Amino acid sequence: MTTVVKHFLRDDDLTPEQQAEVLELAARLKKAPFAERPLEGPRGVGVIFEKNSTRTRFSFEMGIAQLGGHAIVVDGRSTQLGREETLQDTGRVLSRYVDAVVWRTFGQKRLEAMASGADVPIVNALSDEFHPCQVLADLQTLAERKGSLKGLKLTYLGDGANNMAHSLMLGGVTAGVDVTIASPEGFAPLPWVVEAARARAADTGATITLTEDPQAAVVGADALVTDTWTSMGQENDGLDRVGPFRPFQINEALLAKAAADAVVLHCLPAHRGEEITDEVLDGPQSVVWDEAENRLHAQKALLVWLLAQRTGNRP
């Protein structure tokens, strides 16, 4: 039997049906954290951080332990990634040691290069272009609060070219969510990501809307999402990342224009008083803390599902 290696490098690596399977499994694992133990042994998962992390590190390390495994955690400075050998060769070598590799890195092409040589699943724990594990947690959180995801209206406010906006488009429309990206002029999503999202939306019946009007964007929205205006590595890019974004802040006045039962999400860390106010972040419509917890459950489900694709043992 030919071994199937499935990677999760961007949100549309999962079909709508596969994404639904992962989210269903995440809900089950939240209720029964030790129900699946595919890494019993323990078997190893490589966890590589070239960007600093709090939630990603804690949630993956704990999740791997709950699945019976051992996380081998290293930072970019203590490896030779892309320096002494090709990333393809690194993928080949790591595949002989571990059952999966979780990597938080810079450019998406680095992930693609490693995956091209790997015989085990490569998981994007964040890249400059995408943050797909976070969006799985976002979708799990929305499903808990709203039930069916199909037809929900989600509005993201902020830098449309950052990894959260991109992943919300791809992952959102995969789930049948109508996604609106509201961003200042000059900060729209990358065109090739928009094209990919619209291609997936055509399959699911969802919609993608791009706008520079935050007031119109939030009217009737079921969920508002934001992220920091300055992502890691953009601190010295020379762009004004404050003034143009002020109208896109999620505050009580803007939230009042959304649906009465709208929820607010933020991947964290939050810059209080910038992209979101204290009143909203700590308010009754915020689901941010559930969202953060769900990183643990969604990522566990993803690993279980990916490992099952290799073994044929359906979770």
UniProtKB/Swiss-Prot annotation:
PROSITE patterns: CARBAMOYLTRANSFERASE
Residues binding carbamoyl phosphate: S53, T54, R55, T56, Q80, R104, H131, P132, C133, Q134, C267, L268, R295
Pfam families, sorted: OTCace, OTCace_N
Biological process, per Gene Ontology: arginine biosynthetic process via ornithine; arginine catabolic process to ornithine; citrulline biosynthetic process
SS bond list: none
Catalytic reaction annotation: carbamoyl phosphate + L-ornithine = L-citrulline + phosphate + H(+)
InterPro entries, A to Z: Asp/Orn_carbamoyltranf_P-bd, Asp/Orn_carbamoylTrfase, Asp/Orn_carbamoylTrfase_sf, Asp_carbamoyltransf_Asp/Orn-bd, Orn/put_carbamltrans, OTCase_ArgI
Pathway noted in the entry: Amino-acid degradation; L-arginine degradation via ADI pathway; carbamoyl phosphate from L-arginine: step 2/2
Broad class of the protein's primary localization: cytoplasm
Enzyme nomenclature, EC number: 2.1.3.3
Keywords of the record: Arginine metabolism, Cytoplasm, Transferase
Locations listed in the record: Cytoplasm
Chain residues that bind L-ornithine: N163, D227, S231, M232
GO molecular function, a single term: amino acid binding
CC per GO annotation: cytoplasm
EC supergroup of this enzyme: transferase
NCBIfam families for this protein: orni_carb_tr (TIGR00658), PRK00779.1 (NF001986)
Main function: Reversibly catalyzes the transfer of the carbamoyl group from carbamoyl phosphate (CP) to the N(epsilon) atom of ornithine (ORN) to produce L-citrulline.
PANTHER family: ORNITHINE CARBAMOYLTRANSFERASE, MITOCHONDRIAL, ORNITHINE TRANSCARBAMYLASE, MITOCHONDRIAL
Family classification: Belongs to the aspartate/ornithine carbamoyltransferase superfamily. OTCase family.
Protein name per UniProt: Ornithine carbamoyltransferase
Organism: Rhodococcus opacus (strain B4)
Gene: arcB
